[in-house]
Amino acid sequence: MTSVLRVGGVPEHFNYPWRLAIRAGAFESSGVAVEYIDYPGGTGAMADGLRQRDIDIALMLTEGAVLDILRGSGNRLLKVYVESPLTWGIHVAAGSDLTSPAEMEGRAVAISRHGSGSHLIAVVDAGERGFAIDAMRFVVVDNLDGARRSLAAGDAEIFLWEKHMTQPLVDSGEFRRIGERVVPWPAFVVAVHNDALERHAGELRAVLDAVWNTAAALQASADGASRVARAYGISENDAAAWLDGVQWCRDYTMPEAALERV
């Protein structure tokens, strides 16, 4: 009987190759059946999923995966998944009085959950700007839809999220983007709990190699941008710009210096 490998990831274009690979039967020769599960709650929710054994591997933001391990999860990092850095948009509601990141100190920040990327990068951003981190206020909103409600209601005033995914909200006038934060390390890593590592040790590399091959084919295809745009509700121009800049990682060497910085 074929075993099942359960993979968790955010419902964003970075993970589109997993859906394409499943659809194309790219994992059939790997010896496992791959099930991809969306985690709108982000890296914090995936950390819980690994801990509760709801998923076997997770495509986590690097900073969140490292924090989870430092907190004693016992998870392992298999490889870098996306080696290009993530650009976080700093967003406010359309009617907000905030016009610059310099004005953000002391304002309430929407986060998907504590330990998530939206939480950790808000802290990184505040530290880089010299703000008092101990005075930061956070409002847990679960996901992007929760952030939209929270900013509209005025419960939170600031929200950091991957800028291409929020571009439609900026274009529509619901959000304003007042700044960006680019983090100096790879965007995503592949994390695995030890039970899955023991159970699927022989299949994991074949699965991950198949995903990289699918990602490379997507980038090389003439209609790649239009497919991404349709799948994630963004403009084709934004999809093309994102696809041109993203770098899925092929090798299995962990960038020790970057992880130390995290």
Model-found features: residue ranges?
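Secondary-structure end/capping motifs
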Residues: H200-V262
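Conserved hydrophobic/aromatic packing and binding residues within compact polymer-binding modules
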Residues: L50, L151, A239
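Short, glycine-/small- and polar/acidic-enriched structural segments
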Residues: T2-F131, F138-V141, E157-K163, F175-V182
